Amino acid sequence: MNNFRNLINQSIRNYSTTTNVATKTKVYELKTYNILANNIPSFFELLGENKGSNSLGTWVTEMGSSNQVISLVEHESLDDRQMNEWNTKFQSKAAKLIEKQESLILREFPWAPFQKISNEKSNENKVWELRTYQSKPGKLGQWAIDFTTGFAERKKISEPVGVFYSEFGPLNTIVHLWPYKSFEDRFRIRDLALKNPVWVETVAKTTANLDSMESKTIIPVKL
């Protein structure tokens, strides 16, 4: 664990625009709900009625998986999550609508702090991409070091709202959340990024430390 933290800190030093290397105890919870198609409207209604102030966004899957609702929640700490009365009340009401649910507890990489999703950003970006990577055991820190070598170049084209790694749930998991104006906008931006030699080299280095990758396109939902 100490070696992992040392590698994360090294990735911070490599990323020249980062000034604050302190890591807070704040965590993010990525919730994935599998809902029967005819239950989705009722689930959205219930989610809207019980929306907590720490909810950062809700999406429904379009490609990659079907009938999934994705929710991102912020917790000042895991202890706050444990004491959150909303969590208990919502779960008891929603249980009959949910086939399966998963919860992934995430922390943000210090060089990619989460960017709040404003109404304007949500309205402008109709298509979002949730990218999930599984790093090889013991290679997450090295992945972070390699990724930061090209992240500044990639941000010149477009930025994710967050880059996270898992604390609880499947370990060695990396999560990116990218906003796009449309599907064509996504193709255009990714094609442009792959013409940048720095980013191409970064992709080659980072993929060497990964076991798997998954992409879901998700559509924002207004509750």
Curated annotation (Swiss-Prot):
Give the Pfam families listed for this entry: NIPSNAP
Coiled-coil spans in chain: none
Task: Write out the GO biological process terms.
Answer: mitophagy
Which SUPFAM superfamilies does the UniProt entry name for this protein? Dimeric alpha+beta barrel (SSF54909)
Question: Where does it sit, as one GO cellular component term?
Answer: mitochondrion
> How far does the signal peptide extend, from start to end residue?
none
* TM regions (residue ranges): none
Q: Which Gene3D superfamilies match?
A: 3.30.70.100
The entry assigns this protein to a family as follows:
Belongs to the NipSnap family.
PANTHER family assigned to the protein according to its UniProt record, in alphabetical order:
NIPSNAP-RELATED, PROTEIN NIPSNAP
| Full protein name | Protein NipSnap homolog
Lineage of the species this protein comes from? Eukaryota, Amoebozoa, Evosea, Eumycetozoa, Dictyostelia
Name the gene behind this protein. Answer: nipsnap
